[in-house]
Curated annotation (Swiss-Prot):
Region forming the signal peptide: 1-28
Molecular function via GO: toxin activity
Keywords: Disulfide bond, Knottin, Neurotoxin, Secreted, Signal, Toxin
Protein name: U12-ctenitoxin-Pn1a
Compartments where located: Secreted
Length: 100
């Protein structure tokens, strides 16, 4: 008898957790996606986001870093991403980029 009550309690607890997870999943789907900003709509990209130019990265000292930037050009087989730059980057970006 005790085993049956014990089993029933844990079954109800498990079903309650499943129902709670389902409710949060449904609420997440119902939120409008129009409020979400697309990276192109924002003025700049955060650290770690894929970029093509220094001007796309947020902040005065952040740069578009290409770890495998071979031959000095912007040919990057593995892509570039926004990263923290050095102090002189800020002066360079202010000359180059209108949005800094």
């Amino acid at each position: 008898m005790k085993y049956r009550i014990f089993k029933m309690k844990y079954t109800l607890l498990f079903l309650s957790v499943i129902a709670l997870v389902h409710i949060f999943a449904v609420e997440a789907k119902d939120e409008p996606e129009s409020d979400a900003l697309v990276p192109q709509e924002r003025g700049c990209l955060d650290i770690g986001k894929t970029c093509k130019d220094d001007c796309e990265c947020c902040g005065c000292g952040n740069v578009c870093y290409c770890p495998f930037d071979w031959f000095g050009g912007k040919w990057q087989p593995f892509g570039c991403s926004c990263a923290y730059g050095l102090k002189y980057v800020c002066a360079h970006k202010q000359k180059k980029c209108p949005n800094v």
